[in-house]
Amino acid sequence: MIPPEPPQPQLQPPPPPAPPNHVVTTIENLPAEGSGGVSLSASSRASMRQRIRKVLNREMLISVALGQVLSLLVCGIGLTSKYLAEDFHANTPVFQSFLNYILLFLVYTTTLAVRQGEENLLAILRRRWWKYMILGLIDLEANYLVVKAYQYTTLTSVQLLDCFVIPVVILLSWFFLLIRYKAVHFIGIVVCILGMGCMVGADVLVGRHQGAGENKLVGDLLVLGGATLYGISNVWEESIIRTLSRVEFLGMIGLFGAFFSGIQLAIMEHKELLKVPWDWQIGLLYVGFSACMFGLYSFMPVVIKKTSATSVNLSLLTADLYSLFCGLFLFHYKFSGLYLLSFFTILIGLVLYSSTSTYIAQDPRVYKQFRNPSGPVVDLPSTAQVEPSVTYTSLGQETEEEPHVRVA
């Protein structure tokens, strides 16, 4: 008898393949008991040092320093003007501007005249003469209105209302240059203006000379008009030096600025010029003023191209403080600790503003990084997908390609 075969084991169907796991699991090593506090504190200190080093990088510090060079030049302009007006009774703001425009004409306009091709002076005039004519007139009248305002209103009013140039530059940059700001930029701007307010408060407390203030409304309107024209001029300058060239801007400003200031000098200031008691001291002051003004005009496009018109105007807020510190020795001003507080508050605001980059909006979904002091810009290929530097968890298959985004 043949024994029955043992029952064959039933074959189980293979299990279905597991669905793809799109959840990224991160395992962190926990510190050993007893050493956690030391590890965490050391890690937090290292992280804080890295953040500070990232903010206070070389590019940002250079940008702030360049802005302070401009501020020192403005301080030199103010000091020489004060000596001319108060010690020698030479109230000649148009003549002083005329000297600067003549220097720009001799250096930069003649450079354009000897160039060949499309960058020649005549070629530029054929294409854009009316734009530079308007810009030259705006630049001249901006200088004239602010200087003229000192005859009607107080020093405090001029200092406060001159800050109006900052919102003008921001709005014009937003609409015409398409520059987009982050929250930290607005925080930095507010801190800078608070520092300026602290300086004005110190002026009032120590009783610093405020001027006659005979017709404050007229003076205040002159300051607001001058600040508005300054803002238009600065934003237009930024547009020109980014799309064309610094030499073209300065050459055309020298040409039309000298033309219009010469006409205004002949009409409005020729009698004042004849009253000036000329001697070597007055001549030296005019030379010093012209050197500072020429240096400011020549160097400002370099700083604007590296940073922005907004950053430059924030940097110039410290010019009054430099003038005041010089006045402690030259004019025996009274000192207040609020001046130092104001100075460092403005510098903190500048560091905050310069700590991150602004953007130029070229498309609602695509932003191109603007060259600002936080660091060098690296151009990425347009075909490569850029992943933002954040940690995220994907819970499903992506079915649509995301737009390319530059993340600061």
UniProtKB/Swiss-Prot annotation:
Protein name: Solute carrier family 35 member F1
Membrane topology label: Multi-pass membrane protein
Keyword Iron listed: no
InterPro entries: SLC35_F1/F2/F6, SLC35F_Transporter
UniProt organism field: Mus musculus
Coiled coil: none
UniProt keyword Transmembrane helix present: yes
Primary localization class, coarse: membrane
Signal peptide: none
Localization in the cell: Cytoplasmic vesicle, Secretory vesicle, Synaptic vesicle membrane
Any one of the GO CC terms: synaptic vesicle membrane
